């Protein structure tokens, strides 16, 4: 339904549409340039359930649209598209179906990864999403012996108990099956997380650290810098410093990471949640590219994944999501008393931790994150903040 409505709208203003079927978000970012399109559009719920479906738009360069252009599009929609001329007759756009997108994207990934994974046994969770067809072609072609889960999409089960937001099934499968490691994507495959052979999680921080170290050793870490967000673990930051790698920190959101990378000429960046951007090969976060590079690193290292996963100790971190609608999120942003309370909680940690409270841009939630060396202390801190939010914003 969404594809049909979107296609009809585009054709009604004279645009021709090439429909590529079900493909990962980063595939569209790549193919928009390869096919010389003016823009690329993805219908996706990202890592969320299917009822959160929306659209992501890429410019002809393969990069996401800047905020000001997205705001202009939203303004047109809010104004019932006033001033936009609707075409008639022969001027109406046409729709074309293309079946070569999948293979073109797989070929691009294969050439970008450029590795031999022979001898690796890997369990891969495709989240019942767009990565399923790609992963089943790509990783065996690279030489890995793979078992796949989450490869039975029915249009409704995407991200449901599987994928990067539900690692428990993958971790169990890896341990029970004796795999060398596990890889998990989200529904539209712009995120990648993993686990080692012991079933221990590998988040985006760990993956970025490992890939950045490898790039530095090969002289490919531009500016000796990785770009991350304020959510990155303090253990990660301190480890990178110890290895002579700078970290640039941005607001949460892969678009802000990418903006910093492009402005300053950096080659790697990403988020703890699994968005990893490798700018030498891609214009956006690409889960399958990230997985391929990580598996190549593992194969060439001669080590177990648990050894790689243990390169640094993470600081304990507590994350609590408070359900809040748009009005409640707005009220939180404007509450100066609450802001002062949160600042006071930060001071109580006395430099041994940090507090980050933010409004989610993709879900109806206020996220409370507290990090520090004392697990009991950060739990108490998070509880106090959540209780204050509930009382002042939610009236509970």
Tell me what each language-model feature is.
Residues 11, 20, 27, 71-106, ...:
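Proline/glycine-rich low-complexity loops and linkers
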Residues 52, 181, 218-396:
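Phosphate-binding and adjacent anionic-ligand microenvironments
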Residues 53-177:
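Gly/Ser/Thr-enriched, mixed-charge loops and adjacent short helices
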């Amino acid at each position: 339904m969404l594809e049909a409505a979107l296609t009809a709208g585009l054709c009604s203003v004279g645009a021709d549409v090439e429909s590529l079927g079900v493909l990962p978000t980063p595939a569209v970012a790549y193919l928009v340039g390869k096919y010389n399109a003016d823009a690329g559009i993805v219908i996706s719920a990202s890592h969320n359930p299917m009822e959160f479906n929306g659209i992501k738009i890429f410019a002809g360069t393969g990069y996401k649209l800047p905020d000001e252009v997205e705001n202009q599009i939203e303004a047109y929609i809010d104004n019932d598209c006033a001033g936009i001329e609707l075409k008639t007759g022969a001027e109406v756009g046409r729709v074309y179906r293309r079946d070569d997108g999948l293979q073109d994207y797989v070929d691009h990934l294969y050439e970008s990864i450029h590795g031999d994974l022979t001898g690796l046994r890997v369990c891969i969770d495709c989240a019942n999403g767009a990565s399923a067809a790609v992963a089943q072609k790509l990783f065996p072609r690279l030489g890995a012996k793979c078992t796949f889960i989450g490869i039975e999409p029915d249009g409704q089960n995407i991200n449901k108990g599987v994928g990067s937001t539900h690692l428990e099934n993958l971790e169990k499968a890896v341990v029970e099956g004796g795999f060398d490691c596990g890889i998990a994507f989200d529904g539209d495959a712009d995120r990648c997380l993993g686990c080692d052979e012991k079933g221990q999680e590998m988040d985006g921080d760990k993956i970025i650290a490992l890939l950045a170290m490898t790039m530095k050793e090969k002289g490919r870490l531009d500016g000796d810098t990785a770009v991350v967000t304020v959510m990155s673990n303090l253990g990660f930051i301190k480890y990178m410093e110890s290895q002579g790698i700078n970290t640039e920190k941005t607001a949460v959101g892969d678009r802000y990471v990418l903006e910093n990378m492009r402005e300053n000429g950096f080659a790697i960046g990403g988020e703890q949640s699994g968005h990893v951007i490798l700018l030498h090969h891609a214009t956006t976060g690409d889960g399958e590219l990230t997985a391929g590079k990580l598996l190549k690193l593992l194969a060439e290292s001669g080590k177990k994944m648990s050894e790689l996963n243990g390169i640094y100790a993470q600081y304990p971190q507590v994350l609590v999501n408070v359900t809040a609608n748009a009005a409640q999120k707005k009220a939180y942003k404007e509450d100066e008393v609450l802001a002062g309370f949160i600042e006071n909680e930060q001071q109580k940690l006395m430099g041994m931790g940090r507090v980050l409270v933010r409004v989610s841009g993709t879900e109806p939630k206020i996220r409370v994150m507290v990090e520090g060396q004392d697990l009991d202390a950060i739990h108490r801190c998070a509880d106090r903040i959540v209780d204050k939010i509930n009382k002042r914003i939610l009236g509970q």
